[in-house]
């Protein structure tokens, strides 16, 4: 427990996604808890919607004195100390959770981005605006995504209750309960008004007491899902002063340390005729950060930034999203064709849930990878999918299947990888020698 607390002081240990229909308050709820706005890009600010995956860390504290539940729970930024003074009663606030929030876009054309975010989630907040009928289209699709990724812990946040009467809020609460019964998802419904901070302590209470800390394996081989990548150098920086590329994501298993030799798969993908050549990026970790906190080692859970010696041009503008990072020579295989056991959603609010056909083009989400695919041999329960872009993945991994309907990719089903055809990665001679020594 002491070790877990020491880790929690420095980095988040739990990933919670915010999902739901567009403009239902996902980014606002994250800001109410963390104090950080996840809307940062120019296009997002202009339109006041999330376009890329947003992220923010927050520490949740519990007052050990006179404050009673749920008001004994308070949240602050991730750089806050592990003990604070309670301004309500003068008691001591003790750290009980350190959470990374993954803020997903709600617009229908950004469904693939939302699905990428589910790859690293341990639990979700499903936002439903109280001033609109339930369900809205993306509420339904996002709930499908929760089922696909087998996320068991769901908190339904009935937001914007300040915009409706008590009777309207209760009526919509009944709509939400009926909606949840149409799926395999269940969870408590928490009314909030995030814009003015109403009932945020109750939400924190549920995060602490309803969502358990996931069991992590820090002794396994490290595997990090990449959801962001950056070039942090300002224009005009001299070559001798440039920093290497920065990779953002979440460690699923294992540990990473400053100085580790790392590999990123599938890396640089080149098409030669009818075959792919994959050259993984090989680099070294020069820094680890959890927001503004410097780390010497990173544990599974939470979002971290990894500074590398890579050419930053390969990392800029999220070029590495969908790749997988780990220690050199110890990552899953790279597949260009997969056999999937799948099922389509029997109930859907959109058209086009007909059977998949040989030769049809579909979109697959594998981990944080989004890739087009052409269907090969297929029957009602399994099929072969030729990937437009190779993916680093594992047998048994869950995938999401989307079909283009009215010029938009819409989620229609899910599956599990049962087999596949691999690509042998190509390395420079000196890297091959290093791998043999590591083996």
From Swiss-Prot:
Region (G5) location: 193-195
One annotated GO molecular function: GTP binding
InterPro entries in the cross-refs: eIF2G, eIF2g_C, eIF2g_dom_2, eIF2g_GTP-bd, P-loop_NTPase, T_Tr_GTP-bd_dom, Transl_B-barrel_sf, Transl_elong_EF1A/Init_IF2_C
Domain of life, per lineage: Eukaryota
Localization terms from the record: Cytoplasm, Cytosol
CDD domains: eIF2_gamma, eIF2_gamma_II, eIF2_gamma_III
Region feature (G3): 103-106
Chain intervals for the UniProt region annotation (G1): 20-27
Annotated region described as Interacts with CDC123, given as residue ranges: 415-427
UniProt keywords, alphabetically: Cytoplasm, GTP-binding, Hydrolase, Initiation factor, Nucleotide-binding, Protein biosynthesis
Reactions listed under catalytic activity: GTP + H2O = GDP + phosphate + H(+)
Region of interest called G4, as start-end residue ranges on this chain: 159-162
Domain tr-type G per the UniProt entry, residue ranges: 11-215
Record: residues binding GTP: 23-28, 159-162, 193-195
GO terms, biological process: cytoplasmic translational initiation; formation of translation preinitiation complex
PANTHER family linked to this entry: EUKARYOTIC TRANSLATION INITIATION FACTOR 2 SUBUNIT 3 FAMILY MEMBER (PTHR42854), EUKARYOTIC TRANSLATION INITIATION FACTOR 2 SUBUNIT 3-RELATED (PTHR42854:SF3)
Similarity section: Belongs to the TRAFAC class translation factor GTPase superfamily. Classic translation factor GTPase family. EIF2G subfamily.
Subunit-structure text: Eukaryotic translation initiation factor 2 eIF2 is a heterotrimeric complex composed of an alpha, a beta and a gamma subunit. The factors eIF-1, eIF-2, eIF-3, TIF5/eIF-5 and methionyl-tRNAi form a multifactor complex (MFC) that may bind to the 40S ribosome.
Protein name, entry field: Eukaryotic translation initiation factor 2 subunit gamma
Organism expressing this protein natively: Encephalitozoon cuniculi (strain GB-M1) (Microsporidian parasite)
């Amino acid at each position: 427990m002491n070790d877990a607390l020491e880790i929690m002081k420095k980095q988040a240990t739990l990933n919670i996604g915010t999902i739901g229909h567009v403009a239902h308050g996902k980014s606002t709820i994250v800001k109410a808890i963390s104090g950080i706005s996840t809307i940062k890009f120019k296009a997002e600010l202009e339109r006041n919607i999330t376009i890329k995956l947003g992220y923010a860390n927050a520490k949740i504290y519990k007052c050990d004195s006179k404050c009673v539940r749920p008001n004994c729970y308070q949240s602050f930024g991730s750089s806050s100390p592990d003990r604070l003074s309670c301004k309500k009663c003068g008691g001591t606030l003790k750290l009980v959770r350190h959470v990374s929030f993954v803020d997903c876009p709600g617009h229908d054309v950004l469904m693939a981005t939302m699905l990428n975010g589910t790859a690293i989630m341990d639990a979700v907040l499903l936002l439903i605006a109280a001033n609109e009928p339930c369900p809205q289209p993306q509420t339904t699709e996002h709930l499908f995504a929760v089922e696909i990724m087998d996320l068991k812990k769901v908190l339904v946040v009935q937001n914007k209750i300040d915009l409706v009467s008590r009777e309207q809020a209760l009526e919509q609460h009944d709509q939400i309960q009926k909606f949840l019964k149409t799926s395999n998802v269940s969870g408590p419904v928490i009314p909030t008004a995030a814009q003015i901070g109403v009932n945020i302590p109750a939400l924190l209470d549920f995060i602490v007491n309803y969502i358990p800390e996931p069991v992590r394996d820090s002794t396994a081989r490290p595997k990090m899902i990449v959801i962001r990548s950056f070039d942090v150098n300002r224009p005009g920086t001299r070559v001798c002063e440039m920093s290497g590329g920065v990779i953002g994501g979440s460690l699923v298993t294992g540990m990473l340390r400053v100085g580790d030799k790392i590999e990123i798969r599938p890396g640089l993908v080149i098409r030669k005729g009818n075959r792919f050549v994959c050259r993984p990026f090989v680099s070294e970790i020069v820094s680890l950060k959890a927001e503004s906190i410097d780390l010497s080692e990173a544990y599974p859970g939470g979002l971290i930034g990894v500074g590398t010696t890579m050419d930053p041009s390969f990392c800029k503008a999220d070029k590495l999203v969908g790749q997988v990072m780990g220690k050199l020579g110890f990552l899953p295989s790279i597949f260009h064709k997969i056999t999937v056991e799948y099922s389509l959603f029997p109930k859907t609010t959109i058209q086009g849930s007909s059977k998949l056909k040989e030769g049809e083009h579909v979109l697959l989400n594998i981990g944080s990878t989004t890739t087009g695919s052409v269907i090969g041999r297929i029957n009602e329960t399994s099929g072969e999918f030729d990937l437009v872009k190779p993916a680093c993945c594992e047998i048994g991994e869950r995938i999401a299947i989307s079909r283009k309907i009215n010029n938009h990719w819409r989620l229609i089903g899910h599956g599990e990888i049962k087999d596949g055809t691999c690509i042998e990665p190509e390395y420079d001679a000196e890297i091959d020698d290093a791998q043999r020594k590591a083996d």
